[in-house]
């Protein structure tokens, strides 16, 4: 439970003018402050019309007051919402009057933080509030809404419950070290490990998809000069964003273009062609291209279909660190009918459009997996969630290895670390600095 005794206030509606503006109070003085503002009577979950007044009794604004009594509110505390006209000037004056009456200005995300501390939301759900607000399209909004409804958290808890049962069996085996593991539920341990690994693998796959829906995909077009990278970016973007000429080395700097592709944002980055030599400006362009690869989720390796092997040699090991790669043979319209095509690459023509639909399909597969949703549907996730799940997966694998050598103490420690990684997602185990970073990124009124 939160130990806070302060009452906080902030504008909860969107910035700018509008038909309605909302000022939100949360804390033990919320109701008292509303009464002092001029709200004659307040009943829980009833709307009351009132004139909100300043210290001299002059009317600041008129509107509706709503009281949500603790613990039946978003934050778990007494909450009052004052709904007036959407004038930033009047809303700021109303906040200032609330502060005069004993409230303090809320920090960014403090309402959601109090909801978390009071057990109204777990940490993943609290983060989903910001994701719902920031969603760029309907698919991302629905995924964030499912995370807010607890779909992601329940699946994390299911894995954690499986690990709890495993830890009980392993700890029992440690306490009765003279007994063989099989007589202490060894089969249950092995079955539990299999179940935990399966659940984790499925959850990690779906969380990576959820992260892509939330954050999009950073795809870098890489390849030798004159392979048609800029032409391909223009074809995918549907506009002439990059300069295209027949002169090798035309692209000297990086160019970013965001496109929407089946519910997620794909950021394409055109880069300078990689080759030996070149002038100082071109060499700087190649350095920037390699720097973009270090941040890439996906490398789109664009080669000239007429001589892909020579083009491949020019790239060298530049793409080795990129987790996902897609090889594209461009200019396939210039090939003779008898020319062989690499079955592992996609043949396209940025000029004629040949193969672009197949490229779109492959990009969707790389971004969102096989397209098969879980029973609960897609949910939004963040990079920290994916990293925590990967750590949990590594620790479960390590526990399996230690159990194979009957190193029970080491296996128990690995399972504990896996459990801890899952707890970081929902906030059951969280460092104070992590909470501070998460909630400080929220809107003031959230």
Swiss-Prot record:
GO terms for biological process: tRNA methylation; tRNA wobble uridine modification. Its cofactor is K(+). GTP binds at residues 226-231, 245-251, 270-273. It holds the Pfam family TrmE_N. K(+) binds at residues 226, 245, 247, 250. It is found in: Cytoplasm. The keyword GTP-binding applies. Its EC number is 3.6.-.-. Mg(2+) binds at residues 230, 251. Residues 216-368 form the TrmE-type G domain. Belongs to the TRAFAC class TrmE-Era-EngA-EngB-Septin-like GTPase superfamily. TrmE GTPase family. This is tRNA modification GTPase MnmE. It comes from Xanthomonas oryzae pv. oryzae (strain PXO99A).
């Amino acid at each position: 439970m939160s130990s806070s005794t302060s009452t906080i206030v902030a504008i909860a509606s969107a910035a700018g003018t509008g038909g309605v503006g909302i000022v939100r109070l949360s804390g033990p003085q919320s109701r008292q402050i509303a009464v002092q503002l001029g709200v004659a009577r307040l009943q829980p979950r009833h709307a009351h019309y009132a004139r909100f007044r300043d210290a001299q009794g002059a009317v600041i604004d008129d509107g509706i007051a709503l009281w949500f009594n603790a613990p039946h509110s978003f934050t778990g505390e007494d909450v009052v919402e004052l709904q007036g006209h959407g004038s930033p000037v009047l809303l700021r004056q109303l906040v200032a009057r609330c502060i005069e009456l004993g409230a303090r200005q809320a920090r960014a995300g403090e309402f959601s933080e109090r909801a978390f501390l009071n057990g109204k939301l777990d940490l993943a759900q609290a983060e989903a509030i910001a994701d719902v607000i920031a969603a760029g399209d309907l698919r991302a909004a629905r995924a964030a809404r499912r995370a807010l409804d607890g779909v992601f958290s329940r699946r994390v808890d299911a894995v954690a419950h499986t690990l709890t049962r495993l830890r009980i069996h392993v700890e029992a085996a440690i306490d009765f070290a003279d007994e063989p593991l099989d007589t202490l539920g060894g089969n249950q341990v092995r079955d539990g490990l299999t179940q935990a690994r399966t659940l984790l693998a499925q959850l990690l796959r779906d969380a990576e998809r959820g992260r892509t829906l939330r954050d999009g995909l950073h795809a870098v077009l890489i390849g030798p000069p004159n392979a048609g990278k800029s032409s391909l970016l223009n074809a995918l973007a549907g506009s002439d964003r990059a300069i295209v000429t027949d002169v090798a080395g035309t692209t000297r700097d990086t160019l970013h273009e965001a496109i929407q592709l089946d519910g997620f944002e794909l950021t394409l980055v055109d880069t300078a062609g990689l080759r030996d030599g070149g002038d100082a400006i071109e060499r700087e362009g190649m350095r920037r291209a390699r720097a973009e690869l270090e941040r890439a989720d996906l490398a789109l390796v664009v080669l000239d279909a007429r001589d892909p092997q020579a083009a491949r040699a020019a790239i060298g090991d530049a793409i080795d660190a990129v987790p996902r790669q897609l090889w594209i043979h461009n200019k396939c319209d210039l090939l003779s009918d008898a020319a062989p095509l690499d079955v592992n690459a996609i043949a396209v023509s940025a000029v004629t459009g040949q193969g672009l639909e197949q490229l779109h399909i492959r990009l969707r597969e790389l971004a969102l997996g096989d397209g098969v949703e879980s029973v609960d549907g897609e949910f939004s996730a963040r990079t920290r969630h994916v990293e925590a799940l990967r750590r949990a997966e590594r620790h479960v694998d390590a526990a399996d290895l230690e159990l194979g050598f009957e190193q029970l103490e080491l296996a128990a420690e690995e399972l504990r670390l896996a459990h801890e990684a899952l707890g970081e997602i929902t906030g059951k185990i969280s460092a104070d600095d992590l909470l501070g970073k998460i909630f400080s990124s929220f809107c003031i009124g959230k």
